[in-house]
């Protein structure tokens, strides 16, 4: 398979060091506070139907404001920083504040897949992709972030027959299992595989 070959080539290049470093940054969240985890959750809420770069920029600008700013002020900041859906995202972030102890909550579950179900059910603005993104970014390995880049790569390499317009829970888990199989073939965890495929599609290693 062409995708396997491309990933193996990247694993033997300097990109591997960049990806390994990024994974270590994610793992360092195990030693961070509830507040830092909450800010990362807000980043993942922001990136839905937006860009990762835009989310990173806004996260840096707002910082602790995710925890403290009144909704109207947060809305205004998101608008000025160029977020397309500033009203909705401000609403979701303010509603999510009842889970400010998000690290404690997530770590109370037996594994990341159980934690993901909780996040999807309880936090407005968080679907399977966003929940997986958050969990990967705070150091968990066994969840896949299935976005358009990943879907296109799978489609172009004949792992899926079509690019679904929407992803039901069943479809999400089905595609996640395909990615898990690919990961096993190239000896990568889902958290790592995502960064390799993202690099293949975009030439970037983000978060």
Swiss-Prot record:
The active site is at residues 129, 147. It comes from the Archaea. Optimum pH is 8.5. Its EC number is 3.2.2.-, 4.2.99.18. One of its GO terms (biological process) is base-excision repair. Contains two domains separated by the central HhH motif. The C-terminal domain undergoes a conformational change upon DNA binding. This is 8-oxoguanine DNA glycosylase/AP lyase. It comes from Methanocaldococcus jannaschii (strain ATCC 43067 / DSM 2661 / JAL-1 / JCM 10045 / NBRC 100440). The lineage of its organism: Archaea, Methanobacteriati, Methanobacteriota, Methanomada group, Methanococci.
